[in-house]
């Protein structure tokens, strides 16, 4: 029986990178972000370390790509949920859906379960990517950085210190977020 070569046909580099990222996602979800190991990844993908480095980069690039793919899925779900909404209704929906999607995503769960008090996680609040996505998803005007930063911090706070149940959280978001963005 002949085994098919997953690197034959099409764009080999893209095929290899996608396979590497999928395996890295599984390993990271299982073992944690800091436990990503190139040898284990190469074994999982059935390729050499050189193929990993050539097609996907080092650990940092692979972790970034895995997180980017996870974020893209979350962003698409939020974007779909807020389509056609505006103002405070859009912002409340965006926050609620983002919280639900991050919590249901294995990498989202992992990221927030490993954050401990006192750690420097300013990259979450200062990231231009996070700022751009928050601006876009919430329908805010470009340049309203204070509103964007506040929304990002609200979401992070609710992820880090969750409310007892979803209904209470939804009431809190509606009660305190909606008036802040009422026209």
Residue ranges and their predicted role:
Residues 75, 110, 116-149:
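Amphipathic alpha-helical packing segments from all-alpha helical-bundle domains
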């Amino acid at each position: 029986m002949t085994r098919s070569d997953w690197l034959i046909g099409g764009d080999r580099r893209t095929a290899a990178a996608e396979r590497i990222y999928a395996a890295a996602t599984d390993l990271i979800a299982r073992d944690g972000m800091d436990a990503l190991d190139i040898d284990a990844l190469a074994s999982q993908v059935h390729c050499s370390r050189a193929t990993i480095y050539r097609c996907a980069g080092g650990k940092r690039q692979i972790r970034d790509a895995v997180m980017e793919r996870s974020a893209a899925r979350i962003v698409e779900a939020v974007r779909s949920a807020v389509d056609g909404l505006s103002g405070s209704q859009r912002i409340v929906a965006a926050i609620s859906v983002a919280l639900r999607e991050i919590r249901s995503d294995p990498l989202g769960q992992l990221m927030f379960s490993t954050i401990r008090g006192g750690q420097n996680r300013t990259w979450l609040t200062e990231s231009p990517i996070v700022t751009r996505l928050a601006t876009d998803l919430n329908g805010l005007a470009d340049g309203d950085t204070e509103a964007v930063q506040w929304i990002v911090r609200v979401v992070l706070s609710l992820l880090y210190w969750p409310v007892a149940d979803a209904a209470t959280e939804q009431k809190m978001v509606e009660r305190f977020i909606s008036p802040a963005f009422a026209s």
